[in-house]
Curated annotation (Swiss-Prot):
The keyword Iron does not apply. Its main location: secreted. Gene3D superfamilies: Neurohypophysial hormone domain. Disulfide bonds join 23-28, 43-91, 46-58, 52-81, 59-71, 99-111, 105-123, 112-117. It is found in: Secreted. Vasotocin is an antidiuretic hormone. One of its GO terms (molecular function) is neurohypophyseal hormone activity. Belongs to the vasopressin/oxytocin family. Keywords: Amidation, Cleavage on pair of basic residues, Disulfide bond, Hormone, Secreted, Signal. The keyword 4Fe-4S does not apply. This is Vasotocin-neurophysin VT. It comes from Eptatretus stoutii.
Length: 161
């Protein structure tokens, strides 16, 4: 084989390997990368009856004053969520309905991704039936505690940006 043939072969192998999406040994799910969609489990419990939504986000339960739930970003109440992040299989928060670009409704009026939460009107109807246990029924953020939660959440997101 000529030098040009070896060069073309090397370039073809390089192009093929650049297009492949392998998973590293430490983060490959059981059953390989294609098994991810089928092996979802419920996310860990955290806080005061809440559920992990991301590596440092705990939502639901008695958070937010016990009136419809709320979310805590960071702190000791979300500590179990860091351990959940080390699980080889991904988890699916029980929030149910989608919101934003890639988020789920984690509490009434609150949309969370795995990194941050924001106020979202499409999540105002979130109740216990959606999957996350909230202590209130509907409209949980239409109260003084909920208003304070909204302000704290807006300030926290402003600090992150």
């Amino acid at each position: 084989m000529s030098a040009m043939g070896w060069t073309l072969l090397a370039a073809a192998l390089l192009a093929i390997s650049a297009q492949s999406n392998g998973c590293y040994i430490q983060n490959c799910p059981r059953g390989g990368k294609r098994a991810v969609e089928t092996e979802l489990h419920s996310c860990a419990a955290c806080g005061l009856g809440g559920q992990c939504v991301g590596p440092s986000i705990c939502c639901g339960g008695l958070l937010g004053g016990g009136r419809g739930g709320g979310c805590i970003v960071g702190g000791p109440l979300s500590a179990p969520c860091k351990r959940e992040n080390l699980h080889p299989e991904p988890c699916r928060p029980g929030g149910g309905s989608s919101c934003g670009l890639e988020g789920i409704c984690a509490a009434p009026g609150i949309c969370c991704t795995d990194v941050t939460c924001s106020i979202d009107a499409t999540c105002d109807d979130v109740t216990e039936k959606a999957g996350v246990t909230f202590s209130g029924a509907t409209g949980g953020l239409a109260n003084p505690t909920g208003d304070l939660l909204r302000k704290v959440l807006l300030l926290a997101n402003a600090d992150l940006e």
